[in-house]
UniProtKB/Swiss-Prot annotation:
Summary of the function given for this chain in its UniProt record: A GTPase-activating protein (GAP) that modifies Der/EngA GTPase function. May play a role in ribosome biogenesis.
Source species taxonomy: Bacteria, Pseudomonadati, Pseudomonadota, Gammaproteobacteria, Enterobacterales
Gene (name only): yihI
BP GO annotations: ribosome biogenesis
Species for this entry: Yersinia pseudotuberculosis serotype O:3 (strain YPIII)
Record-given protein name: Der GTPase-activating protein YihI
Quaternary structure annotation from Swiss-Prot or TrEMBL: Interacts with Der.
Length: 188
C-alpha cells in the first residue's frame, strides 16, 4: 500500500514561477565520510606532539637574534664540571664587629642578681598566694630557681632550712633510743 506523494509546497516568499531547489538526501556513506572528516579535524585541534617539552620549536616567531630564556630553568649561575686547582676566592670585606662582649659575671654576682630579681619575687609572691601561673611564668620561675640552686652548690652555700630537719631527726633518734633502752636516765 503505497501512499500517494504529497504535492510540493510552494514557497510563499518566492514568486510563483520559481520553484525552490529540492534538497537531495545524503546517503549513509556520505554522512559517514563527513563524520570522519569532522572527527579528524577535531582530533587535530590541540597542540602538536612534543609541544610541551620542545619550547624552542613553539616559540619560533622570527626572533632569531634575541633568544628567550626558558622559564623552567632554575639557577643562572654556571656550575663548573671540572675542579680547577686555581679557585678564585672572592674577598669579601669582613664586617666590623659592633657587638661588645658582655663581661661574664662571677657566680657571686650572678647569684646576687638572681636573688634581687623583681620579676622572680613577684612570681614567688603569687605562688605563695596560691595563684596559678601560666606556662611561660612557671618556666621562668623553674629555670631561675634551678640556676640559683646550681650557683649555691657551686659556691658551697647551704640553705638554712636544713637546721630544722636536723633537729627533728635528732629528736626522733632520741625517742627511738629511749624506747630501746627503756629508761631515759640510763646513759653511759
Amino acid at each position: 500500500m503505497k501512499q500517494p506523494n504529497k504535492a510540493p509546497r510552494a514557497n510563499i516568499a518566492a514568486p510563483k514561477g520559481t520553484a525552490t531547489p529540492k534538497r537531495r538526501r545524503k546517503t549513509r556513506d556520505e554522512l559517514d565520510a563527513e563524520a570522519r572528516d569532522r572527527k579528524r579535524q577535531k582530533k587535530h585541534s590541540g597542540n602538536r606532539s612534543g609541544a610541551r617539552t620542545n619550547v624552542e620549536g613553539s616559540n619560533k616567531k622570527g626572533h632569531s637574534q634575541t633568544q628567550e630564556k626558558d622559564p623552567r630553568v632554575g639557577s643562572k649561575v654556571p656550575v663548573p664540571l671540572v675542579i680547577e686547582s686555581q679557585v678564585k676566592a672572592k674577598s669579601m670585606p669582613k664586617p666590623v664587629e659592633n657587638n661588645v662582649v658582655k663581661p661574664r659575671l662571677t657566680p657571686e654576682e650572678e647569684l646576687a642578681k638572681l636573688e634581687n630579681d623583681e620579676r622572680l619575687d613577684a612570681l614567688l609572691d603569687r605562688l605563695d598566694n596560691d595563684e596559678v601561673l601560666n606556662k611561660e611564668d612557671q618556666a621562668y620561675v623553674d629555670l631561675t630557681l634551678d640556676r640559683i640552686d646550681a650557683l649555691m652548690e657551686q659556691l658551697g652555700i647551704e640553705l638554712g632550712d636544713d637546721e630544722d630537719d636536723v633537729e627533728r631527726e635528732e629528736k626522733q633518734e632520741d625517742i627511738l633510743q629511749l624506747l630501746k633502752r627503756g629508761n631515759p636516765k640510763d646513759t653511759f
